[in-house]
Amino acid sequence: MPWPGRGHINPMLNLCKSLVRRDPNLTVTFVVTEEWLGFIGSDPKPNRIHFATLPNIIPSELVRANDFIAFIDAVLTRLEEPFEQLLDRLNSPPTAIIADTYIIWAVRVGTKRNIPVASFWTTSATILSLFINSDLLASHGHFPIEPSESKLDEIVDYIPGLSPTRLSDLQILHGYSHQVFNIFKKSFGELYKAKYLLFPSAYELEPKAIDFFTSKFDFPVYSTGPLIPLEELSVGNENRELDYFKWLDEQPESSVLYISQGSFLSVSEAQMEEIVVGVREAGVKFFWVARGGELKLKEALEGSLGVVVSWCDQLRVLCHAAIGGFWTHCGYNSTLEGICSGVPLLTFPVFWDQFLNAKMIVEEWRVGMGIERKKQMELLIVSDEIKELVKRFMDGESEEGKEMRRRTCDLSEICRGAVAKGGSSDANIDAFIKDITKIV
């Protein structure tokens, strides 16, 4: 049972694919709304993953960003009953329920029916530690805070698994994100009643945070990722005939900046105008995915050195030899896709966990660069700053650029090793399967 959103459904589906590929006796019932079945129902998947639907009684994916708080409330209050009805219709009760951590009621449903629940947290273990330890933040006077407070330069150095971090980098603690956090805080309480905790990360990316959870909970904690379907890239090359791949094939190696601001919340119109001017004036080749504003963006970028598309196969594009950098909103899926593809990341976070992901990319893993706001909580990053950063980021001949690309390749190898035979995540997925199949 994933949270109904692209950044949650994708890693959950990739986890389920990994499970059924390993055990021929496993069958997965993957629960989505009728609307989401329309989005993903035709995507390739193993035969032993079956979709089951809940009615469209929550706001549409197409408008949920208009009132995200109302969308969250709908998921948390309207879907529990139809989910239970779906369980009643199954031929036999499931061996286990894997539910997104944000689905607060899933653990309650499993407990009532004596079905063990594995809580699947779809972003970094580090930010979950921040959430779980919000009382520590409060005791230090760091939660909640207002963006204007002078203490934003103070350092948070007491959260397990989180390296010393400026309060201003934890934007989840104030403003709109604070409202969202207060709603989800209940789900972190339910987490203690789960039977397993799963992460989409590799242990090697976040050892301190994952060690914290392993010691904190008296149930198994498994890092299972990166849950990036690299094995699917060798199957079906029909996409090579698409015009955008033909364009990429014509570009020099590592010369193109891939730009994607994600599939949900994006930047303001004023900020987008600054980004457009900055990228255009940087004079680099670019491949820009614009969900919803393709025509307008094409007009604004007419005569520049790139292409604009409304959609692309992101992982295949990132793995193309022409791609030399990835401008990203820092959603965790995209972050892991970039790292696994060996592509440096240019961070432009917008919301929620993305700011902390950006910090880890730039400061901890050192596989990218980010905009440095000259003023705390600066709302608009101007085109001149963007232009200079893009030029610096795409300069593969500078010592800084060479080092960043070397580190990215090294981290890519580490992540691929985690999911390879005998790797840390490979072993964890095997252990999880043994756990849930022992229950039968």
Curated annotation (Swiss-Prot):
Transmembrane segments: none annotated. GO terms for molecular function: UDP-glycosyltransferase activity. The keyword Transport does not apply. UDP-alpha-D-glucose binds at residues 263, 312-314, 329-337, 351-354. Signal peptide: none annotated. Belongs to the UDP-glycosyltransferase family. PANTHER family: FLAVONOL 3-O-GLUCOSYLTRANSFERASE UGT76E12-RELATED, GLUCOSYL/GLUCURONOSYL TRANSFERASES. This is UDP-glycosyltransferase 87A1. SUPFAM superfamilies: UDP-Glycosyltransferase/glycogen phosphorylase. Its EC number is 2.4.1.-. Pfam families: UDPGT (PF00201). InterPro entries: UDP_glucos_trans (IPR002213). Keywords: Glycosyltransferase, Transferase. The keyword Glycosyltransferase applies. The gene is UGT87A1. It comes from Arabidopsis thaliana (Mouse-ear cress).
